[in-house]
Amino acid sequence: MADIAQKIKATGEDFEERIVEIRRTTKVTKGGKNLSFRVLAVVGNRNGKVGVGVGKAREVPDAIRKALSAARRNVFKVPIHNGTIPHEIVGRQDAAKVLLKPASPGTGIISNGTVRAVVELAGIHNILTKSSGSTNPVVLAQATVNGLKNLLSLEKIAELRDITPQEVIHGVKKEG
């Protein structure tokens, strides 16, 4: 684990950390109940990089440390255009679905707490979201991550359509 911390420090990235959920879990055995804790953490630099992680341990501080370490290992890049996402997308994970829609400047982040934590730390300022299905915070966070990972940048969209990025933003005028 020291290697991960050294890699993060070596890159010079300064990630903001947020604990989304701390849940006490119980395993019942013939010897009694075993208590442990599950923590959902999000890290991001508010500039297009975000990661989500889950940690489990018998003590809360250990679970938090494990969750933050897992989140730092899972950091990925999010394409952002004018403070929002380039296009609409649906993220799915198990029984949860999260619809992510770009919003005009000044809209803010319209979402529930779990999705808000992920998109805020990614650096998105204007977005509309709608979650349906499961309300489990871990599954919602993973569905949001799946949606953000499947976003295409404006350059990639332009390349696929064989037009310039400016034409993607402003639309292409039809000839004829």
Curated annotation (Swiss-Prot):
InterPro entries membership: Ribosomal_Su5_D2-typ_SF, Ribosomal_uS5, Ribosomal_uS5_bac-type, Ribosomal_uS5_C, Ribosomal_uS5_N, Ribosomal_uS5_N_CS, Ribsml_uS5_D2-typ_fold_subgr
UniProt-listed PROSITE patterns: RIBOSOMAL_S5 (PS00585), S5_DSRBD (PS50881)
Gene Ontology process terms (BP): translation
GO cellular component: small ribosomal subunit
Gene Ontology MF term list: rRNA binding; structural constituent of ribosome
Keyword Ribonucleoprotein among record annotations: yes
SUPFAM superfamilies the UniProt entry points to: dsRNA-binding domain-like, Ribosomal protein S5 domain 2-like
One Pfam family linked to the record: Ribosomal_S5
Keyword annotations: Ribonucleoprotein, Ribosomal protein, RNA-binding, rRNA-binding
Domain of life: Bacteria
Domain S5 DRBM, chain residue ranges per copy: 15-78
Written domain comment of the UniProt record: The N-terminal domain interacts with the head of the 30S subunit; the C-terminal domain interacts with the body and contacts protein S4. The interaction surface between S4 and S5 is involved in control of translational fidelity.
Record's subunit section: Part of the 30S ribosomal subunit. Contacts proteins S4 and S8.
Protein family membership: Belongs to the universal ribosomal protein uS5 family.
Purpose of the protein: With S4 and S12 plays an important role in translational accuracy.
PANTHER family, A to Z: MITOCHONDRIAL RIBOSOMAL PROTEIN S5
Record protein name field: Small ribosomal subunit protein uS5
Species of origin: Thermosipho melanesiensis (strain DSM 12029 / CIP 104789 / BI429)
